[in-house]
Swiss-Prot record:
Presence of the UniProt keyword Transmembrane helix in the record: no
Protein name: tRNA-2-methylthio-N(6)-dimethylallyladenosine synthase
Catalysed reactions, as listed in the record: N(6)-dimethylallyladenosine(37) in tRNA + (sulfur carrier)-SH + AH2 + 2 S-adenosyl-L-methionine = 2-methylsulfanyl-N(6)-dimethylallyladenosine(37) in tRNA + (sulfur carrier)-H + 5'-deoxyadenosine + L-methionine + A + S-adenosyl-L-homocysteine + 2 H(+)
Cytoplasm keyword on record: yes
PANTHER family documented for this protein: CDK5 REGULATORY SUBUNIT-ASSOCIATED PROTEIN 1 (PTHR43020), MITOCHONDRIAL TRNA METHYLTHIOTRANSFERASE CDK5RAP1 (PTHR43020:SF2)
Lineage: Bacteria, Pseudomonadati, Campylobacterota, Epsilonproteobacteria, Campylobacterales
Sequence positions that bind [4Fe-4S] cluster 2: 150, 154, 157
Organism: Wolinella succinogenes (strain ATCC 29543 / DSM 1740 / CCUG 13145 / JCM 31913 / LMG 7466 / NCTC 11488 / FDC 602W) (Vibrio succinogenes)
Gene: miaB
Residue ranges annotated for the TRAM domain, each copy included: 372-433
Assembly with partners or alone: Monomer.
Gene Ontology terms: cellular component: cytosol
Cofactors (names): [4Fe-4S] cluster
């Protein structure tokens, strides 16, 4: 009987890809098969996020719950950014944990599972960081890491501490992985990096210098890959050359995530973001002039230390002007190893929560308005999933919108045109042409 693996993944797309990496390693090298029931698992992995405090606090209650439910001989491993941050503290607080594996060490999973109380949390570079996973949870889409770590020093962000110095993956390895994925039937690749468009600034050893824009051009030449996406770019590095390539390259999906964080130039300066409200708006206007169909998503933090009502209204102003399609928004959470952690001018919790509610409520209205405008429009959709119980196929447009259509397995993996006939906040309903 094969060994069973259960994995819980929290946080960003980087964590999702790290989990895919560990699953593929354990399936190929250790004979594990995936289960969605922790009670039958021989190995339970919790791949953690530490961007905010709440998920970190919740980790230990989850460990306690898994410890009660698991088979007596089953092991629990804590992986990811909280593992990098807390290290051996996890073993002290949760004796039922067998090992701790940091975000930069996921390639060591096959070795660590055989060690009792191992702690692997180094954030320095080693060649194993470039190992690509051999599996994906989707037959038609795949994620590829093109850089590891982050060199930015945003005042609120713990990621440079948990994921280490930024290193670019050599382009020949990325292109080789893209060709392998294409040969396996993958149609769409999502390129991953903490500051993905900062790619090419540093390699581990002697490699040809290549920029992110040049990498996009080369990847678009890979036969079989029909769509390219990437996350998350930094607004500061969205130069005109990049924007022109984004707009003119037909394989680059016209959907982009531009983390704003705040619409106040004063708060952006305190955050150490390196740009102003004016710069951000300028980049959006330039992008829309080149590719008006582009949809834009963002991240926003409300209640950053010192944020006034006027500062918050600056954020609301940008929301109105840009009309973001997707919004990931949170109340500021102080994190250790960050500049802002020691600041005392915190915003009252009730005030911050009320601002978050206003922001999210207005965004919901904007999203409904944007989606209603899609009725009657024609889009090309890559069909990714089938909801057999409901008879629907699901996929995404080039602009990143979720579409449902009545249909069977014959659509899966194909890109077909549809006309949008109904619109809801979370998805659109299409009909084939």
């Amino acid at each position: 009987m094969s060994k069973k693996l259960f994995i819980q993944t929290l946080g960003c797309a980087m964590n999702v890809r790290d989990s895919e990496h560990m699953i593929a390693e354990l399936e190929a090298k250790e004979g594990y098969t995936l289960t969605d029931d922790p009670k039958e698992a021989d190995l339970i992995l919790i791949n953690t996020c530490s961007v905010r405090e709440k998920p970190e606090r919740k980790l230990f209650s989850e460990i306690g719950q898994f410890s009660k439910e698991k088979k007596e001989e089953a092991k629990i491993g804590v992986c990811g950014c909280t593992a990098s941050h807390l290290g051996s503290e996890i073993l002290k607080k949760a004796p039922s944990v067998s090992f701790v594996l940091g975000a930069r060490n996921v390639s060591k999973i096959s070795r660590v599972i055989h060690q009792e109380k191992a702690v692997e949390v180094a954030t320095d570079y080693d060649d194993s960081s470039y190992v690509f996973a051999t599996g994906s949870r989707n037959d038609y889409k795949a994620m590829v890491n093109i850089s590891i770590g982050c060199d930015k020093k945003c005042a609120y962000c713990i990621v440079p501490h948990t994921r280490g110095q930024e290193i670019s993956v050599p382009s020949d390895l990325i292109l080789g992985e893209a060709r392998r994925l294409a040969s396996a039937g993958v149609k769409e690749i999502l390129l991953l990096g903490q500051n993905v468009n900062h790619y090419g600034r540093r390699f581990s050893s002697a490699h040809p210098k290549i920029s992110f824009t040049e990498l996009l051009r080369e990847l678009s030449q890979v036969e079989g890959i029909e769509r390219l996406r990437f996350t998350s770019p930094h607004p500061l590095h969205m130069d005109d050359e990049f924007l022109e390539e984004f707009a003119s390259n037909p394989k680059i999906c016209k959907s982009i995530h531009m983390p704003l964080q705040s619409g106040s130039t004063r708060i952006l300066s305190l955050m150490r973001r390196g740009y102003s409200q004016e710069w951000f708006i300028n980049r959006v206007e330039r992008l829309k002039a080149l590719a008006p169909e582009t949809t834009i998503g963002t991240d926003i933090i409300v209640g950053f230390p010192g944020e006034s009502e006027e500062d918050f209204l600056g954020t609301m102003e940008v929301l109105e002007r840009v009309r973001f399609e997707t919004l990931y928004s949170f109340v500021y959470s102080p994190r250790p190893h960050t500049e802002a952690a020691s600041w005392e001018n915190l915003v009252d919790e009730e005030v911050a929560s009320e601002r978050l509610h206003r922001l999210q409520a207005r965004h919901k209205e904007i999203l409904e308005e944007l989606n209603q405008k899609e009725v009657g429009a024609i889009h090309s959709v890559l069909w990714e999933h089938q909801r057999r119980d409901e008879g629907w196929c699901e996929g995404r447009t080039d602009t990143g919108k979720m579409v449902r259509m009545k249909g069977g397995e014959e659509f899966l993996g194909r890109i077909t045109p549809v006309r949008i006939k109904e619109a809801y906040r979370a998805f659109l309903i299409g009909e084939p042409l």
